[in-house]
């Protein structure tokens, strides 16, 4: 794959789009790997307005929801979806919410994406087809090949179920 050509094509599509991409991160891992974009630590209407007004096509919201209870994450994700729909209407923009987490075992999947879908469908009057799972985190050394998720240790790829973390009952 010609990475330079691919990046140029993606940049051209993003520039032509009237869509804002909002990435929700359930812990700080993801935001540690990005640059030149805004990262908000709340989802107030005021913060979302700043994100929608910014020229960048994408912004992050660090929810830290991995550490939330079910009740807390339910409240937070309903608020995020409602506030995002409200602000998008104000700006006359389409949007896409990406729920980014690097652990489906320790996070609130599928609760969070189900809530986002439920509220977004109700707010916007269209049906979403489902979730797209992308088990890939290059910066964290995590890859999926032939339906097996691996963690890179140096030059070696180890199936994640065989890592020290998978065996550590206090980790998850």
What are the roles of these predicted feature ranges?
Residues 36-50:
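Short catalytic helix/loop segments, enriched in acidic residues and glycine
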Residues 6-11, 47-49:
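Short secondary-structure capping/turn segments at boundaries of alpha-helices and beta-strands
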Residues 39, 58-60:
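Conserved beta-strand scaffold positions in the cores of enzyme catalytic domains, especially
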Residues 61-66:
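Short loop/turn segments at strand-loop or loop-helix junctions that form parts
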Residues 11-25, 32-35, 51, 55-57, ...:
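Cap/lid and interdomain-hinge subdomains that line or gate substrate/regulatory clefts
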Residues 1-8, 40-43:
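Short coil-to-helix leader/linker segments, especially the first N-terminal amphipathic alpha-helix
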């Amino acid at each position: 794959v010609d990475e330079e050509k691919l990046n140029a094509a993606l940049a051209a599509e993003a520039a032509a789009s009237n869509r804002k991409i909002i990435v929700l991160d359930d812990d700080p891992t993801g935001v540690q790997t990005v640059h030149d974009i805004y990262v908000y630590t709340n989802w107030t209407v005021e913060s979302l307005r700043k994100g929608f007004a910014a020229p960048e096509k994408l912004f992050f919201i660090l929810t830290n929801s991995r550490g939330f209870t079910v009740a807390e994450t339910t409240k937070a994700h309903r608020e995020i979806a409602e506030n995002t729909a409200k602000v998008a209407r104000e700006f006359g923009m389409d949007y896409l919410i990406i729920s980014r987490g690097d652990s489906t075992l320790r996070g609130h999947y599928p609760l969070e994406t189900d809530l986002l879908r439920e509220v977004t469908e109700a707010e916007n009057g269209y049906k979403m087809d489902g979730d797209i799972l992308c088990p890939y985190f290059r910066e964290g050394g995590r890859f999926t090949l032939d339906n097996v998720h691996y963690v890179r240790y140096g030059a070696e790829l180890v199936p994640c179920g065989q890592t020290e973390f998978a065996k550590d009952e206090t980790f998850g």
